[in-house]
């Protein structure tokens, strides 16, 4: 039995919730071997999610069912098995629609436990918030804005 089986993803954390507070709220469900609150690499500020690993996977399942949707430090938290992907369990990610980012970045097959906890881009906040441009300076959106804004094809005329 691997430690991944007893590993839970905890999302929606208050930015002030630390490892000790997280452990305090989950320790009543059984022995915990590891608690991690994921932090931004540059600012060391919490990214609002973390992981808890129980020594017994059954304890993790009980904790997940009991704590999912509960309030922790004034925020409603989401608890799920760390190995599951966001797409497979929530139909597309946890509220990431329209912002260009989800917890399981890089595709639907990579779960929360994939090891991609940090945003490696400078600043860490620019991902997905603007239109990307190609090397000619044109938008990669649905139409070329320099063509007069006509985004309809010839079949619509």
From Swiss-Prot:
Cell location: Nucleus; Cytoplasm; Cell projection, Dendrite
InterPro entries named in the record: Nucleotide-bd_a/b_plait_sf, RBD_domain_sf, RBM, RBM3/CIRBP_RRM, RRM_dom
GO cellular component annotations of the record: cytoplasm; dendrite; nucleoplasm; nucleus; spliceosomal complex
Gene source species: Homo sapiens (Human)
Recorded GO MF terms: ribosomal large subunit binding; RNA binding
RRM domain location: 6-84
PTM-bearing positions, type Phosphoserine: 147
Induction behaviour: Up-regulated by hypoxia.
Annotated function: Cold-inducible mRNA binding protein that enhances global protein synthesis at both physiological and mild hypothermic temperatures. Reduces the relative abundance of microRNAs, when overexpressed. Enhances phosphorylation of translation initiation factors and active polysome formation.
Modified residues (Phosphotyrosine): 155
Gene behind the chain: RBM3
Pfam family, one: RRM_1
Region (Disordered): 81-157
Residues annotated with Asymmetric dimethylarginine modification: 105
Residues bearing the modification Omega-N-methylarginine: 47, 105, 121, 131
Assembly behavior: Interacts with RPL4. Associates with the 60S ribosomal subunits in an RNA-independent manner. Associates with ribosomes.
Residues modified as Dimethylated arginine: 105
Post-translational events: Arg-105 is dimethylated, probably to asymmetric dimethylarginine. Phosphorylated.
Protein name (database record): RNA-binding protein 3
KW RNA-binding (keyword) present: yes
PROSITE patterns cross-referenced by the UniProt entry: RRM (PS50102)
Biological processes, Gene Ontology terms: positive regulation of mRNA splicing, via spliceosome; positive regulation of translation; regulation of translation; RNA processing
Domain of life: Eukaryota
Predominant cellular place of this UniProt entry's protein: nucleus
Keywords: Cell projection, Cytoplasm, Methylation, Nucleus, Phosphoprotein, RNA-binding, Stress response
Record Gene3D superfamilies: 3.30.70.330
């Amino acid at each position: 039995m691997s430690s991944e089986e007893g590993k839970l993803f905890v999302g929606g954390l208050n930015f002030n919730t630390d490892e000790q507070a997280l452990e305090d709220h989950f320790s009543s469900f059984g022995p915990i071997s590891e608690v991690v609150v994921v932090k931004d690499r540059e600012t060391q500020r919490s990214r609002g999610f973390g992981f808890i690993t129980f020594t017994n996977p059954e304890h993790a399942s009980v904790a997940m069912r009991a704590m999912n949707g509960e309030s922790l430090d004034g925020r409603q938290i989401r608890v799920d098995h760390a190995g599951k992907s966001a797409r497979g369990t929530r139909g597309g990610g946890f509220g990431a629609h329209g912002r260009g980012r989800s917890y399981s970045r890089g595709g639907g097959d990579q779960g929360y436990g994939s090891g991609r906890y940090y945003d490696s881009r400078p600043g860490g906040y620019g991902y997905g918030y603007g239109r990307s441009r190609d090397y000619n300076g044109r938008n990669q959106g649905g139409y070329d804005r320099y063509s007069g804004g006509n985004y309809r094809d010839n079949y619509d005329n």
